[in-house]
């Protein structure tokens, strides 16, 4: 897994092309899928020791096909969750082509990875959109590609294939660590994904009238995973 913890936290674009699901055990279409999702300032390598111990268990080894989701962990959580959803759709289609007889998924998330896992069991729509924008998405003056990025981040369905989620030290109510002064300094140098930077700039320049006060605050300040892990984060 070609992720380096700190650089992947700070420099999204350098690692963006490596984001996605990686199969870490042999393909077995008749098995259930278990997906491991690492946390902030981490990488798929964090699961190495756990996987070695897991593979030693014959019952678990025979039941599950293992995958891991790798991602640059400094980007905003909704953006990363949208990418995980896309990766899950691609994985399900791939396994179906290979003759998968079932598509039951277990997600295991550590730290922020647990928040991404939880997002796969949730639904979102107009109620969440209206917290940020005061016009419908189709009336927003942005390019069609940027509109789809927004749609994927805010309008989504849960995955019926996800039958179980295991949380490992997950900050469901935020983390005080993300609010300390040192982390705030780190947050200031986290690189925003280029797609999001362009989208935010376009909204501020052409559609600022469409933003709610909360939306305007987010658009002007920007938001990354460290900001969103603060207990006071909206």
Regions found by a protein language model. Give the residues of each.
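Flexible, membrane-associating and regulatory peripheral segments of lipid-active enzymes
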Residues: 1-36, 43-49, 65-69, 90-100
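Alpha/beta-hydrolase fold catalytic core
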Residues: 7-20, 25, 200-234
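A general structural signal for short secondary-structure junctions and capping/turn motifs
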Residues: 26, 98-99, 155-158, 229-234
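Serine-dependent carboxylesterase/thioesterase catalytic core
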Residues: 34-40, 69-221
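Amphipathic alpha-helical segments in well-structured domains
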Residues: 47, 51, 81-84
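Short amphipathic alpha-helix adjacent to the substrate-entry channel of hydrolases
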Residues: 48-64
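Intrinsically disordered, low-complexity boundary segments flanking structured domains
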Residues: 53-57, 152-154, 227-230
């Amino acid at each position: 897994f070609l992720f380096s913890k700190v650089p992947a936290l700070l420099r999204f674009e350098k690692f963006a092309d490596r984001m996605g699901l990686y199969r870490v055990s042999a393909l077995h279409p008749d098995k259930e899928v278990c997906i491991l999702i690492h946390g902030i300032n981490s990488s798929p390598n964090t699961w190495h020791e756990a996987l070695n111990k897991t593979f030693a268990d014959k019952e678990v080894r025979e039941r599950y096909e293992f995958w891991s989701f790798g991602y640059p962990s400094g980007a905003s959580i909704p953006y990363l969750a949208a990418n995980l959803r896309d990766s899950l759709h691609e994985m399900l289609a791939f396994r179906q082509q290979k003759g998968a007889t079932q598509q039951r998924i277990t997600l295991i998330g550590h730290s922020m990875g647990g928040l991404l896992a939880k997002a796969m069991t949730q639904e979102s729509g107009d109620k969440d959109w209206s917290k940020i924008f005061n016009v419908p998405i189709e009336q927003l003056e942005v390019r069609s590609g940027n509109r789809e990025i927004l749609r994927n981040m805010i309008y989504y369905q849960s995955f019926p294939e996800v039958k179980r989620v295991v949380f490992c030290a997950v900050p469901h109510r935020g983390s005080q660590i993300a609010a300390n002064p040192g982390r705030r300094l780190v947050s200031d140098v986290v690189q925003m994904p280029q797609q999001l930077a362009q989208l935010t700039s376009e909204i501020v320049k052409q559609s600022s009238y469409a933003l709610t006060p909360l939306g305007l605050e987010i658009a002007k300040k920007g938001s990354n995973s460290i900001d969103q892990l603060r207990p006071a984060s909206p």
